[in-house]
């Protein structure tokens, strides 16, 4: 990236809710991510080597889970893309709270990454937050970069 040019990042969130337990029809899993579009602002890499999004709210609930462990994962559909330019998705990480059940991590386009896990039911709707961070660099071409993230809440 040349001086005076900026790269903005937009991550689009998709939500998946899966139940794989043998009595899956009885399980009730709920997941909501807000906002659905996550924006990381642009800035001079010398003054801001790491760029952060506003906190993303993760609302989830697990019921009738028969004491099984639940798992929340995220995977990117590819690298960040702006026209012909790309930024490796592994340049994007997140800071999570509360810990537990949430944990910090780095995005991947090949392997779903664990965001949170816990035992049994989460009877009341519960909330966690994720703050996405981009390792900023002058090597990025100016542009608006986008990618889709798929969040999945599942039980074994």
Protein language model regions, located:
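N-terminal secretory signal peptides that target proteins for export/translocation
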Residues: 1-4
